Amino acid sequence: MTVLSEKKCIPCEGGVPPLEKKEIDKLLAELQNEWQVNELGHLYKKYKFPNFVKALDFANKIAAIAEQEVHHPNLNISWGVCNVEIWTHKINGLTENDFILAAKIESKI
């Protein structure tokens, strides 16, 4: 079995169904703690930092990973916090790409 962080995101062209709950739960178990699926059905994690600059630095590191993977999360930065929200926009749901990106964020930061 390939570790999620070692996989590559595959561009989604739409027309594919979002993952089912059983698949989501399986992939969620492969991620580190605190990742969850929010009320919108998006993958979500809140990261805390000692100040705004550290949160911004973290967001910039995520941006570099997202550009490499051509899969982009929503980031919300405030003082000492960076909220990361990931989903596949073209299908408005979760795909394996979302979990790959989350795993890469965890493994490289």
Swiss-Prot record:
Protein's recorded name: Putative pterin-4-alpha-carbinolamine dehydratase
Cross-referenced SUPFAM superfamilies: PCD-like
Documented EC number(s): 4.2.1.96
Membership in a protein family: Belongs to the pterin-4-alpha-carbinolamine dehydratase family.
GO terms classed as biological process: tetrahydrobiopterin biosynthetic process
Organism of this sequence: Rickettsia canadensis (strain McKiel)
UniProt xrefs under Gene3D superfamilies: Transcriptional coactivator/pterin dehydratase
UniProt-recorded Gene Ontology molecular function terms: 4-alpha-hydroxytetrahydrobiopterin dehydratase activity
